[in-house]
Amino acid sequence: LQLFKVFNVSRGQKIEKRLAKMGIVLPAPLVLPSNNRTSAVQSGNLLYVSGHGAALLDDSDIVKRGKVGIEVSEEDAYRTARACAIKMLATVKYYIGGLDRVTRIVQIHGLINAHPDFERHNMVLNGASDFFYEVFGEEVGCHSRYAMGVGGLVARQPIEIDGIFEISAE
């Protein structure tokens, strides 16, 4: 069962154009108003992106609070994970100047605020994984990951994701 269309990846095609074809407009990036932390840190050719949670999303159609498996359906949590991934791309673009510099999505981590009996954390995080694969294709978008159920998140968010992106030099 394929839930999304994978665009043909070619070297000349720009990621921003692909997003536009998908009807996706990047939201404002996550910029933390703090001296002791940042929403992304570059070390060598890796960009470490801080957690992006549902409470930070601009989309009013996304579920921003609640526990998956009780107040939030698996389908809504999947859509929320996808929206968090879109917000992450906005942050990546803000920090490195352009998404075409992403050469690999190395890893994503998902924290799912879920009922203790909920067992499909991996399906929720597929919202982000499917999105990255759809946008970047197999070579760049296929990544390692983990999905973990937790007893709670800040502001009762249903999900928070962070990631590691490999980037090219300017």
Please annotate each region the language model reported.
Residues Q2-I86, A90-H109, A114-E170:
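N-terminal presequence-like segments and the immediate start of the first folded domain
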